[in-house]
Amino acid sequence: MCRAPMPSTVSEISRIYHQPLPDLLFEAQRVHRAHHDPREVQLCTLSNIKTGLCPENCGYCSQSVHHKSGLAAQELSSLDAVMAEAQAAKAAGSTRFCMGAAWREIKDGPPFERVLEMVRSVAALDMEVCCTLGMVKPHQAERLKQAGLTAYNHNLDTGPGYYPQVVTTRTYKDRLETIRAVGAAGISVCCGGILGMGESLTDRFELLESLGSLDPTPESIPINCLVPVAGTPLADSSPVEPLDLVRMVATTRILFPDAMVRLSAGRLQMSEELQALCFLAGANSIFTGPKLLTTPNPEHSHDQKLLEKLGMEPKTTQ
């Protein structure tokens, strides 16, 4: 279980973030080396097992029924299709396979039973298994754990003050309750946020403060950069400043020494140099493969070449 060092108030987080960049990167790298192999990067693959028709109104998401993104809806994938993806991901070097469904919440019944069978089958490949399926009740979290689920992803997205500007159909409290249910079942918590939705630096610091208040703190923290999608409310958002991303990664690493800091959405828009700086700042995981749910993402071969250039290597053990 992970605990964030104290203090982690907004003012303390701001102090860490605003250090001169050489000092910030030095401290982040020092912490990173004390807790992780600095040459290793865990490769993860995310599969969209049910696409579109989500009743939530998350302003960034192409899968919402409230937006006109033109995305074609797809029903829950078959077990054979999911296993083919998982086996290909493992062959390409991924050690964690994540399955995402565009649901508001898990509902008991045949679809959930099919997801449980997917979890059991992927776990049998000796891979870490993660799901992101919306809100989850305690008894459902227990069943996922029994099926072999390693981690459950449920992002806070942003700080609590800015959150209502992004989502109104699900409260911050709803998200926290799901995270508590997952943790209570003994499932690792994967929880992070999205940068570039119009939030302020203070909103980003409040996100980190909220993550630090979780007990246990997340084992996995995805840091996403918004990929604007036509037809969504955030389609015209400005890109995240590169050094703002680097500072956010470094600050996250310092605050959460044991966590896997996952450089997630938006990598296709990042230069190799920016990604290298993020690794120096303490990122030690990426999502690899042609898509991240519905948005384009670097292919496995591209990521393998990047790691080779940097003298880094995929993490081979769970």
Curated annotation (Swiss-Prot):
Domain of life: Bacteria
Keyword Kinase: no
Binding site for [4Fe-4S] cluster: 54, 58, 61
SMART domains assigned: BATS, Elp3
Names of the cofactor(s): [4Fe-4S] cluster; [2Fe-2S] cluster
Record EC number: 2.8.1.6
UniProt similarity note: Belongs to the radical SAM superfamily. Biotin synthase family.
HAMAP family, per database record: BioB
Assembly and oligomerization: Homodimer.
Protein name: Biotin synthase
Protein species of origin: Gloeobacter violaceus (strain ATCC 29082 / PCC 7421)
Encoding gene, per UniProt annotation: bioB
